[in-house]
Amino acid sequence: EGSVSTVPGSYKEFITNDRQIREARKNIWKCIEHIEHLSARTGKKLHLGLEPEPMCYLETTSEAVKFFDQMRKDRKGDLRIDEHLGINYDCCHLAIEYENPHEALGRLVSHKIKISKIHLSSALKVHPTMKVREALKGFSDEVYFHQVIERRVGGEIFRYRDLPDALAANPSNQPHLPEEWRIHFHIPLHHLPTGLFDSTVDHLLGTLDFLKSKPGICSHLEMETYTWEVMPESMKQRSVVDQLVDEYRWTLEQMSRHGLLDKA
């Protein structure tokens, strides 16, 4: 069996009309057809996973469900979509959207959407005080895009394209101060909370809980921390190799605790 993840259609701001979405769906159907032929030729079970990401065309599981519903309407009765297209569930991305892993994964499963792959990943989570905002400057870089989703005290959600945009916002001008920021910065899975920074590793652990309760829904789990070279100096005290070893150990320990090592 083989899986490949890909972008969730496009970046939301790039979409200006329905024609673009129709073309995207047509292209994805072309991918499904190609994967079907490739599967037949190789004798392997192959599938493509669309990976929802903050501020992209598909960024939540609800949006993913609506998209798959439309894909199925385009070609009623064509079951190849169930075999060769699914969702690549990135724990970091869906945690940033404040989704509950049991509800999010349950939503996909109940709509018979394949879980093509799961990215075991964790996002940066903070209460954005002035001290925290100052410390967050160390996470800004010119390599990756770090979207920020802010939850305000009343529950309202506000999005920033990138971390520098969020840091530039003047909190004194905001009528509703933010309660929490979740930042698209993949941090090591074994990272321990500090006085300033926390992580969304609880979403990852909830995902493992779901996999334990629903064995067999996904056999492709992938550690997805890739930001080693752009982390603040305070998180680069040890070599990348040593940190990768620790991340592997942590992941295997958590999978063992959830009884998943023999099922994954």
Regions found by a protein language model. Name each.
Residues 1, 34-46, 79-81, 111, ...:
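A structural motif corresponding to the C-terminal end of an alpha-helix
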Residues 21-34, 101-104, 200-208, 241-251:
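Well-ordered, non-membrane alpha-helical segments in soluble/globular domains
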Residues 64-69, 79-210, 216:
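Active-site capping/gating regions of soluble enzymes
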Residues 58-63, 101, 232-240:
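Short glycine/threonine-rich loop-to-helix capping motif typified by GTGT followed
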Residues 227-264:
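Aromatic-rich peripheral "rim/lid" segments of glycoside hydrolase catalytic domains that contact
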Residues 1-86, 96:
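Active-site acidic/histidine proton-transfer and metal-coordination neighborhood
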Residues 8-13, 52-56, 91-95, 122-126, ...:
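Active-site-proximal loop/turn and secondary-structure-junction residues that shape catalytic pockets
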